[in-house]
Amino acid sequence: MENILGLVALACGLIVGLGAIGASIGIALMGGKYLEASARQPELINELQTKMFILAGLIDAAFLIGVAIALLFAFANPFVLA
């Protein structure tokens, strides 16, 4: 029983930690490409900015889904029988 709870805690930490790292890297790369594209074509800044914010929201939403799954495992663990 304690073994399962310990592994679930480890899995929750990995889900949140690796998800945060992945989302941070993704948003950083996208922001860099946005700055590069807006420097090349300044007339497209408005369209690029809109698309960048939509994609940033989608990347962040994927991370938040991972956080929700980690919270599900942490507080309503389906692997532990009551």
Curated annotation (Swiss-Prot):
The keyword Ion transport applies. The record marks 60 as: Reversibly protonated during proton transport. It is a multi-pass membrane protein. InterPro entries: ATP_synth_csu_bac/chlpt (IPR005953), ATP_synth_F0_csu (IPR000454), ATP_synth_F0_csu_DDCD_BS (IPR020537), ATP_synth_F0_csu_sf (IPR038662), ATPase_proteolipid_c-like_dom (IPR002379), F/V-ATP_Csub_sf (IPR035921). It comes from the Bacteria. The chain crosses the membrane at residues 7-27, 53-73. The keyword Phosphoprotein does not apply. Pfam families: ATP-synt_C. One of its GO terms (molecular function) is proton-transporting ATP synthase activity, rotational mechanism. It is found in: Cell inner membrane. GO terms for cellular component: plasma membrane; proton-transporting ATP synthase complex; proton-transporting two-sector ATPase complex, proton-transporting domain. Keywords: ATP synthesis, Cell inner membrane, Cell membrane, CF(0), Hydrogen ion transport, Ion transport, Lipid-binding, Membrane, Transmembrane, Transmembrane helix, Transport. F-type ATPases have 2 components, F(1) - the catalytic core - and F(0) - the membrane proton channel. F(1) has five subunits: alpha(3), beta(3), gamma(1), delta(1), epsilon(1). F(0) has three main subunits: a(1), b(2) and c(10-14). The alpha and beta chains form an alternating ring which encloses part of the gamma chain. F(1) is attached to F(0) by a central stalk formed by the gamma and epsilon chains, while a peripheral stalk is formed by the delta and b chains. F(1)F(0) ATP synthase produces ATP from ADP in the presence of a proton or sodium gradient. F-type ATPases consist of two structural domains, F(1) containing the extramembraneous catalytic core and F(0) containing the membrane proton channel, linked together by a central stalk and a peripheral stalk. During catalysis, ATP synthesis in the catalytic domain of F(1) is coupled via a rotary mechanism of the central stalk subunits to proton translocation. Belongs to the ATPase C chain family. This is ATP synthase subunit c. It comes from Paracidovorax citrulli (strain AAC00-1).
